[in-house]
């Protein structure tokens, strides 16, 4: 898999929760590792970045499931290859050299992957 995770944080929206359940099943993650977070029921880049800063440092790999335009903006913030839109059911993965989630807003990722078709 391109994605690995210890925990899935998801918006409380029905479609986001359903996506999280499918993702957990696909990645063999126990459903108890899905955490519903009302803070992720937002379309704001700033609010999602603030949530990321509060992730417990016991986790080194997390998945966030949420909403646009916030996730498109986060992808563009960390990637040199800008996109117009992160479509439904698409993802991007970031890797950082840090053990502290509160630091990543100021860091450049050491890798960036996505499952977007070219030209999106």
Regions inferred by a protein language model and the residue ranges of each:
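Short, flexible active-site-adjacent loop segments at beta-strand->alpha-helix junctions, enriched
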Residues: 14, 40, 68-70, 90, ...
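Domain-level recognition of soluble alpha/beta enzyme cores
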Residues: 81-117
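Residue-level signal for well-ordered alpha-helical positions
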Residues: 22-23, 77-78, 97
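Non-DNA-binding regulatory cores of transcription-related proteins
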Residues: 55-58, 63, 68-90
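Phosphate-coordination/substrate-recognition cap region in phosphate-metabolizing enzymes
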Residues: 1-60
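An N-terminal RHG(E/S)-centered segment typical of histidine phosphatases
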Residues: 1-4, 57-59, 106-108, 114-120
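Low-complexity, flexible helical/coil segments
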Residues: 43-47, 70-73, 98-103
